[in-house]
């Protein structure tokens, strides 16, 4: 599942960059910029759907990766496991910032 995580992460970064090119964070124009992306940008609706569903797939792959690590006893490797926990917490914080704050 590690390679799927890499593919999901690259897809999220690329689609996020494409969406950020057309998004306006102003309180009055935010909704209209999302509507603009879906209606006027070539394949904007597809890019938006790939980005939203890719986030869910990314977290499913993370949970499968963690589950595989627990099943195989990788938590016994303290340093590796702690780095993974830190990366997981940073991913959760980034997802929270990207979902709640805009």
UniProtKB/Swiss-Prot annotation:
Please give the superkingdom of this protein's source. Answer: Eukaryota
Q: Name one GO cellular component term.
A: mitochondrial inner membrane
Cofactor (UniProt): heme b
Keyword Transmembrane attributed: yes
**Which positions make up the signal peptide?**
none
Show the GO MF annotations. metal ion binding; ubiquinol-cytochrome-c reductase activity
**Location(s) in or outside the cell:** Mitochondrion inner membrane
**Membrane topology field:** Multi-pass membrane protein
Q: Name one GO biological process term.
A: mitochondrial electron transport, ubiquinol to cytochrome c
Cofactor, how bound (note): Binds 2 heme b groups non-covalently.
Residues annotated to bind heme b b566 = 65
Q: Which UniProt keywords apply?
A: Electron transport, Heme, Iron, Membrane, Metal-binding, Mitochondrion, Mitochondrion inner membrane, Respiratory chain, Transmembrane, Transmembrane helix, Transport, Ubiquinone
Q: Which residues bind heme b b562?
A: 51
Q: Does the keyword Transmembrane apply?
A: yes
Write out the transmembrane intervals: 1-21, 45-66, 81-101
What role does this protein play?
Component of the ubiquinol-cytochrome c reductase complex (complex III or cytochrome b-c1 complex) that is part of the mitochondrial respiratory chain. The b-c1 complex mediates electron transfer from ubiquinol to cytochrome c. Contributes to the generation of a proton gradient across the mitochondrial membrane that is then used for ATP synthesis.
> Quaternary arrangement and interactors, per the entry?
The cytochrome bc1 complex contains 3 respiratory subunits (MT-CYB, CYC1 and UQCRFS1), 2 core proteins (UQCRC1 and UQCRC2) and probably 6 low-molecular weight proteins.
Write out the similarity annotation.
Belongs to the cytochrome b family.
Give any extra note attached to this record.
Heme 1 (or BL or b562) is low-potential and absorbs at about 562 nm, and heme 2 (or BH or b566) is high-potential and absorbs at about 566 nm.
Annotated protein name in UniProt: Cytochrome b
Annotated source species:
Plethodon yonahlossee (Yonahlossee salamander)
């Amino acid at each position: 599942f590690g390679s799927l995580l890499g593919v999901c992460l690259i897809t999220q970064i690329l689609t996020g960059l494409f969406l950020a090119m057309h998004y306006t964070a102003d309180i009055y124009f935010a909704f209209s910029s999302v509507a603009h992306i879906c209606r006027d940008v070539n394949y904007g609706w597809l890019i938006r759907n790939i980005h939203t569903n890719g986030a869910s797939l990314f977290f499913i792959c993370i949970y499968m990766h963690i589950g595989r690590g627990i099943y195989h006893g990788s938590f016994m490797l303290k340093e590796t496991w702690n780095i993974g926990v830190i990366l997981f917490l940073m991913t959760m914080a980034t997802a929270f910032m990207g979902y709640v704050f805009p």
